[in-house]
From Swiss-Prot:
PANTHER family: ACROSOMAL PROTEIN SP-10 (PTHR17571:SF34), URINARY PROTEIN RUP /ACROSOMAL PROTEIN SP-10 (PTHR17571)
Signal sequence bounds: 1-21
Tissues where the protein occurs: Testis.
Keyword Glycoprotein (UniProt): yes
Protein name from the UniProt record: Acrosomal protein SP-10
Primary location class: cytoplasm
Glycan-modified residues: 258
Native source organism of the sequence: Homo sapiens (Human)
Sequence repeats by residue range: 66-70, 71-75, 85-88, 91-95, 110-114, 115-119, 120-123, 125-129, 135-139, 140-144, 145-148, 150-154, 155-159, 160-164, 165-168, 170-174
Composition-biased stretches (Polar residues): 152-163
Length: 265
């Protein structure tokens, strides 16, 4: 009996540590051992019926223990499986919560980014009127310059107004031209003077010159401060009638033909 109980205890320990397939195999081996032990049991039952009944009760108790052990092993495995699945579910739930928090943080970040960009957009839109204002101020700066240019234009008109005076002098030349046309090819003795006072008196370089071809007798009057200072007369090939101004000094050029002295004071 002690040996049989020892074998059953070893079986229960093996069934608790083995897989689900091992208890079935071990139960088959125990049944085989039980059938083997039943032979001495029958032998014992021949000798002593009370021993056979005790052996039967012991075998039925061992079978009950084996079933209880296998059921406890299955329930323990089921409990471990449920515990593992519960931990897995909790781990998934825990891993799902950071993802949810990250998703929420991502939504919060995405929500904040447009709000951060909106002031910058408003700032740019606020700067745009400044650029437009600067562009608007630039034409206003250019407008006075245009007005200044328009103000300078009358001075140009004034210069153009002076031009008719030259035309008037050229008109005098034209009036003298018919006279020269009648005497083309004639020789004219022109009075020359290097320095003549305002009274028409030659003070230096007095003489005569002969006009040839297109030469004319020319008189130069020099004025300073609006007052006649001196005069110069001689023969010149090119004789334009005009007024020249330079640093407060004015020079009047008078051209004449068929006259020995152009000064008419």
């Amino acid at each position: 009996m002690n040996r049989f109980l020892l074998l059953m205890s070893l079986y229960l320990l093996g069934s608790a540590r083995g897989t689900s397939s091992q208890p079935n195999e071990l139960s088959g081996s125990i049944d085989h051992q039980t059938s083997v032990q039943q032979l001495p049991g029958e032998f014992f039952s021949l000798e002593n019926p009370s021993d056979a009944e005790a052996l039967y009760e012991t075998s039925s108790g061992l079978n009950t223990l084996s079933e209880h052990g296998s059921s406890e092993h299955g329930s323990s495995k089921h409990t471990v499986a449920e515990h593992t699945s519960g931990e897995h579910a909790e781990s998934e739930h825990a891993s799902g919560e950071p993802a949810a928090t990250e998703h929420a943080e991502g939504e919060h970040t995405v929500g904040e980014q447009p709000s951060g960009e909106q002031p910058s957009g408003e700032h740019l839109s606020g700067e745009q009127p400044l650029s437009e204002l600067e562009s608007g101020e630039q034409p206003s700066d250019e407008q006075p310059s245009g007005e200044h240019g328009s103000g300078e234009q009358p001075s140009g008109e004034q210069a153009s107004g002076e031009q008719p005076s030259g035309e008037h002098a050229s008109g005098e030349q034209a009036s003298g031209a018919p006279i020269s046309s009648t005497s083309t090819g004639t020789i004219l003795n022109c009075y020359t003077c290097a320095y003549m006072n305002d009274q028409g008196k030659c003070l230096r370089g007095e003489g005569t010159c002969i006009t040839q071809n297109s030469q004319q007798c020319m008189l130069k009057k020099i004025f300073e401060g609006g007052k006649l200072q001196f005069m110069v007369q001689g023969c010149e090939n090119m004789c334009p009638s005009m007024n020249l101004f330079s640093h407060g000094t004015r020079m009047q050029i008078i051209c004449c033909r068929n006259q020995s002295f152009c000064n008419k004071i």
